[in-house]
């Protein structure tokens, strides 16, 4: 695929809201979300093609395609796989924290169904600056949700206070140290992984 890691942060405006976008793996590096929030993003769009993939993480792995093909007859078995550690349970370990810690709205999208030789579990959702899910796609098929973003939540959320309480003089030299990125993700080639 012609997919490469991003090399800059982007904040743009939509109808008065400052928005950022971090694609898939970029969201796994917590500093990316913080940097985008510090650039003024109120909403961060997070398009993904993730979950239900091979991984050394306990409980991770592929979904048996038979479960997807049989979803009309046995939705419960598929839902258990989709919501377990291969999918939603893993997502809930980190995604709400990105919204909460940075006091931003998060618009997370992920496909459902066949993606080449893998089955994806969807779980597209919108989270508020408190890290609470305000809308989520739960159908075992195509779905979409909408939500109303409330500007006041941006400053009411704990993450807003914590961002303002930061003391970069304590850790700027630590966080800013030179570091060679080693991104070990399946879809990157060896050439790209070593950049």
What spans do the regions from the language model cover?
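Short secondary-structure boundary motifs at beta->alpha junctions and helix caps
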Residues: 143, 151-154
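Cysteine/selenocysteine-centered motifs that mediate thiol-based redox chemistry or coordinate metal-sulfur cofactors
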Residues: 4, 8-39, 46-48, 154-195
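Short gly/ser/thr-rich secondary-structure transition/capping motifs
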Residues: 2-3, 89
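Charge-rich, low-complexity amphipathic helices
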Residues: 58-59, 63-67, 120-121, 128, ...
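CN hydrolase (nitrilase-like) catalytic-core segments centered on the catalytic cysteine
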Residues: 18, 27-144
């Amino acid at each position: 695929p012609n997919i490469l890691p991003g090399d800059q942060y982007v904040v743009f405006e939509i109808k008065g809201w400052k928005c950022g976008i971090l694609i898939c793996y970029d969201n796994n590096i917590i500093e990316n979300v913080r940097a985008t929030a510090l650039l003024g993003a109120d909403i961060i769009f997070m398009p993904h093609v993730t979950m239900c993939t091979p991984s050394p993480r306990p409980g991770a792995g592929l979904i048996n395609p038979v479960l997807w093909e049989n979803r009309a007859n046995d939705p419960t078995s598929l839902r258990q796989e989709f919501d377990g550690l291969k999918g939603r349970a893993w997502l809930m370990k980190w995604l709400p924290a990105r919204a909460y810690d940075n006091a931003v709205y998060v618009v997370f999208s992920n496909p459902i169904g066949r993606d080449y030789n893998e089955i994806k579990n969807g779980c597209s959702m919108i989270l508020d600056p408190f890290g609470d899910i305000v809308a989520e796609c739960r159908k075992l098929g195509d779905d979409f949700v909408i939500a109303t973003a409330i500007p006041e939540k941006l400053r009411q959320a704990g993450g807003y206070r914590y961002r303002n309480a930061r003391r970069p003089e304590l850790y700027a030299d630590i966080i800013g140290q030179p570091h060679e990125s080693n991104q070990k993700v399946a879809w990157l080639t060896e050439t790209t992984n070593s950049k």
